[in-house]
Structures are given as structure tokens and as C-alpha cells.
């Protein structure tokens, strides 16, 4: 039997998913050529995957399996998408460049690798990759703040 807290969790997650998908659809429809809109679509979809992957019944069934690795990878890489989104919002001359895709792909691969090696006993390499994964959100949050600060006077 579902508890009131479980039902509230499902309600809030469902609402958030609906809003994220609506935002992605509206940005795609209304601003098909704007880099900030594309970055907004990407982060909205990435966050939708993260919300779905964090649902308790999905975590119970998929955690530790290879099927869960892309969800973890996307969740880790969302920090990079946040940085790209901020860059696109504040920099009028923003264009998506290869280093943006490289940063996103690297963060995703790091998250996937750590998910797939979750059952492995602690090794120096695993400790290093887990430390790097924990640093990803902090590093890209700082980069987002720097990007906003660099361009805020122009706006």
C-alpha cells in the first residue's frame, strides 16, 4: 500500500517531468535556431532522465545493472549542460563548440564507468574516478558563475 509520502513523491516527480518536457517542447518550437533554446532543451531532457532515474522503484530494479549506467552518466553530465546553458544565456555570441561536447561526453563516460564498476572493491583508480565525479558539479557550477559574471554587465 502506498503511503501519503510515496504518493506525494510520485505527484511531485510527475509534475516536474511534465514541466521539463513542456519547457523542452516550447523552447524547441518557439526558438528553433537560438543556441540558448537548444541548451535549454538539452538540460530539460537531461533533468527529465535524472528525475526518472531517481524514482525509487526504478533505482530498486536497475541500480547496479548496465541498463542504469546511461542514466547515471546523463545525471553527472547535467552539470556540464548547466554550464553550457548559462554560457548560452549570457554570451550573445555563443556557439556550441567541440569542447562543450567533449566536456559533456567526458562527464557522461565518467558517470557510466563509475556506475558499471560500482561492485568493484576500492582501488586507487576507482577512488580517483569517484573523486572526479564528485568534483564535476562543483567545477561546472564555478564555470557557470564565471560565465555569468563575465557577461552580466553587457546584459
Question: Which residues are covered by each model-predicted region?
Answer:
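N-terminal low-complexity or simple alpha-helical regulatory segments
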Residues: 1-155
